[in-house]
């Protein structure tokens, strides 16, 4: 487990004070750098030792067959797996004739710092070779947020105490060996030497390698160039082969003298462009990087992040761990999305190969809501990517005998890649999640152009899907049968409340959008009768409720299922230790489902219903998904269980910084990183938008004395500053001088020239805090109990 001893809690950086080889893979994920197009895992500069080497290009993948013991109609035949592309991070250092390797000689000191404001990873190492020669190595790495195709590394070697001859080999390496993976289905499939050489060339101080995939027919280019500064004589040579290019720098250093190398990297890929065009694109990016220079790249990186933090920062007084974690999470969300530009945001970002690099409902459901308030330009690009796959989604729906569009449960380029349909294709709610993301973007930004550009078609086709999936019974009630909600331990059910409410929202949203764009809707074949049918279905959707228990049923009949024996089944996650045929017919819940419905469709439940539902479902949720803790934090906060909510917020925030699920090695959990913001801002800040108006109603737990957060709303920058007695709203620059929002159910008009301060609304819980299944209390509570 990652501990505070080696990773101290600091507000604006993640710092590793000593190197633990047993945690290399985890630290490589934490220290990953990305801009949404290029992703570099935080591997050591010298390439070895490593936990999992990784260099990724967004949506650059290979196709592999999906094997079935018993295949059926409609099963996807091929899967998609992210490819580890050409590694440009490597600097091999020889001191005399001995390679710098942290496993040999003496590592006198070692430190790595991820700077969340500078957008850089800095490493400082002091090493004594087996022969007694000492050097200090300092490297700083960045993936440019300002220049999409560019990464760069500054590598400095300093001689200590005596003269040393140093040799630095700066490399581009393709088809690296990757370690064996586990049988865990959440871990990536292995691809053996996935790239075929196309072309290679070299210059005096650089090289370029081009490769393509075999089955997906994607082509990529990776190039490097170097600047070298050193006192005295230096020899520089470059050679290139199909899978390896190397620039070698040899010099002698007296004590205190330094060799400084700046390595510029450029990456690009395409499924359409010619070899010369792709080669020239990479070469042009390299020239542009050298023109900017190392300092220019640093300055542009800082400026980009300064602007982001001005709209996104969250300050948490009283809880330094959550303070560090929420900034860490926001930083990685920005990295995953900033320059993705009409490509997917994978569930692991570009930090690892977990889940094969696929995007799920996590993107629209958890990541985009945060970015809509903090980096809306990235959301628009992510939604454009999803809309670009609409034709594939329509083909998938037709294959399944349905109308409209059926978006894939997991994918890289738009085709369904889930081999397990009960927890894949049957999770139809992803279509409504996508529709809600389009609607939230329109409401929060006030920008209707994206809906007109591509959102309307998505809303219409997803509405058509729901109408063909559902049916009215003889009493006129509308049902959805054979669906799976967010809880994957209760699959293929009737009338999952979350799915039905989200489908109803999708249907109403589509009808409303057609009224805003009548000519475009008519061109897509929408009639008045079709819109009326959408609204009829939405208004008649069945929402199961157990009158005797006074709670909503997660799905029809859920509260009558057998109770799960939590005392006898204590090895988690259950998906790796229990058969689905035992999980499906029992009241055991993988992750927030009905509870998530109360967050996303808050207006559909009364305060009393929320309190009783939280009390019932808390006792049955095991949180075998990283998506659950943030939602439980939000709803526990809303019903008044503030300390329990704080524990869930801690768990959501620290899932990767403390490796709470023991799988950070495979990449970071983007949705849970988003969940840190959600738990704090939506949970304790009381942010809601499901009724089309900005509503903020904060209430803080005892462990947080002050919560101050920034967000964007319809062109305004808003600062919310809450403590235990009052909340202050500061309206910044925007399209006008005033904004009407809602606080504690009452309209409040803010003015740009005057902060508004109002007393917080105190809430008393209707019920005492509920217990959790044995051994599944929030992580922080268990730690405090020891």
From Swiss-Prot:
Pfam families noted in UniProt: Glyco_hydro_65C, Glyco_hydro_65m, Glyco_hydro_65N
Active site: 488 (proton donor)
Region Disordered, annotated ranges: 762-786
Keyword Membrane in record: no
Record-listed substrate binding positions: 361-362, 590-591
Keywords recorded for this protein, A-Z: Glycosidase, Hydrolase
GO terms for cellular component: plasma membrane
Enzyme Commission (EC) number: 3.2.1.-
GO terms, molecular function: carbohydrate binding; glycosyltransferase activity; hydrolase activity, hydrolyzing O-glycosyl compounds
SUPFAM superfamilies according to UniProt: Galactose mutarotase-like, Six-hairpin glycosidases
Any one GO biological process: carbohydrate metabolic process
Bias-annotated ranges (Pro residues): 766-776
Family: Belongs to the glycosyl hydrolase 65 family.
This protein's name: Uncharacterized glycosyl hydrolase Rv3401
